[in-house]
A protein has these predicted regions:
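Acidic, negatively charged sequence signal
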Residues: 1-23, 34-99
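Short, acidic, Ser/Thr-enriched surface-loop or helix-capping motifs
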Residues: 27
């Protein structure tokens, strides 16, 4: 008997610190799916590390929501909500990642 194996591809959006010591991933819905910490990140104070993870998670989330906006616009969906970020808004937030 042959078993059918169904593969599902999960679209992942990442945000990475400038030194690549912290990498945060979210799925298409914006749910966190991973945090990777390199040894350099472990030298940070707990509060600073947490703040950086949150900011990178926010950037990854914004990227996932931008992808949704672009898909909706590509499918000519009318009235794409203002709750979905624009490319300029995501780029502006990305510029605040100074670590």
């Amino acid at each position: 008997m042959l078993e059918s194996v169904q593969q599902t591809t999960v679209e992942v959006f990442e945000a990475t610190s400038n030194d690549e010591s912290i990498i945060v991933s979210v799925d298409r819905q914006g749910a966190s799916v991973g945090v990777q910490l390199e040894p350099e990140a472990m030298d940070l104070a707990d509060e600073e590390l947490a703040a950086r993870i949150i900011r990178l998670n926010t950037l990854a989330y914004l990227r996932s929501q931008l992808a949704l906006r672009l898909e909706m616009e590509g499918n000519h969906v009318e009235n794409v909500g203002s709750f979905l970020p624009t490319e300029d808004q995501v780029a502006a937030f990305a510029m605040t990642i100074d670590f």
